Amino acid sequence: MTDYFIQENSLYRRLRDDYFNYDRIIIAYDIDDTVRPYKEYNTSCEKTKQLLKECKEVLNPYFIVFTANSDIDEVEKFLEQEELPYDKINENIDIIVYENNIKSKVFYTIFLDDKAGLKEAYEALNKLVTEVKSNERI
């Protein structure tokens, strides 16, 4: 038996299936070193920011910002300044129903984070956007 979710392209296949089966996905993303350079590295986050904006136009997903930053006002100010899409910060969207109202974790279809396989998540999401824009299933 093979570990399906560590096979090549499994992330994209699952993302694609969820999008076409449910017509809407939930994109969660971190702030530091994902959409905003952090102190330690001199890097750009422009490609990820642009992809999130394109996702909003093409996929119409829900967006959750999932961050360790406790200054939510500062986070909101940054998101608005950068015109980054978000529906919730560190919370599930309202359609998520918990068994016994136990909120165990934030639910998402895909997570973009510099410490959690950002390159693979970026590529899978970009591939889905390209596919949906072209109206051809890859």
Walk through the language-model features, giving the residues of each.
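HAD-like aspartate-dependent phosphatase fold
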Residues: 1-138
